[in-house]
């Protein structure tokens, strides 16, 4: 009987270690950055524009994430850009992907159409770009890999992250 109790106790401790070992506390600096970003987003004035974060992946054709002002990044949509009226910033400079992770104020609208992207085998909303303003070349992190800082571009080449 005593051996059975020891076995159950050891099993419970092992199981607890597995479950709680995956729990991760967020470092204080990162938590502060998230709070500041939330406050900044909440202070964005309403208007006829969107906030975009360029998300460049060499094998994919989507442009990046787009959200409405005042809304958190978790509500952003990964979009295909319609550039018939205005070229994307990196395409305008003929320096594709050079603006990865830049943040923009975007002028335009969602067309209501969906566009197939073959590399990801995904269907994304189309955003018709009419203009843009650069907000930041070094905005706060919005992806889990940026918070952790331990993933290399090679590790993430075929991973499509979602903002948090």
Model-derived features: positions:
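OB-fold and OB-like single-stranded nucleic-acid-recognition modules
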Residues: 25-164
């Amino acid at each position: 009987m005593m051996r059975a109790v020891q076995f159950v106790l050891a099993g419970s401790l092992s199981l607890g270690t597995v479950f709680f070992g995956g729990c991760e506390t967020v470092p204080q600096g990162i938590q502060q950055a998230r709070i500041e970003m939330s406050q900044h987003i909440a202070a964005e004035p309403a208007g006829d524009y969107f906030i975009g974060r360029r998300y460049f992946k060499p094998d994919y054709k989507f442009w990046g994430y787009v959200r409405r002002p005042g809304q958190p990044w978790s509500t952003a949509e990964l979009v295909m850009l319609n550039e018939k009226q205005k070229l994307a910033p990196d395409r305008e400079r003929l320096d594709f992907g050079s603006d990865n992770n830049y943040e923009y104020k975007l002028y335009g609208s969602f067309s209501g159409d969906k566009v197939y992207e073959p590399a990801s085998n995904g269907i994304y909303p189309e955003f018709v770009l009419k203009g843009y303003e650069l907000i930041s070349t070094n905005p706060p992190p919005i992806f889990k890999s940026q918070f952790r800082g331990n993933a290399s571009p090679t590790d993430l080449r075929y991973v499509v992250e979602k903002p948090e």
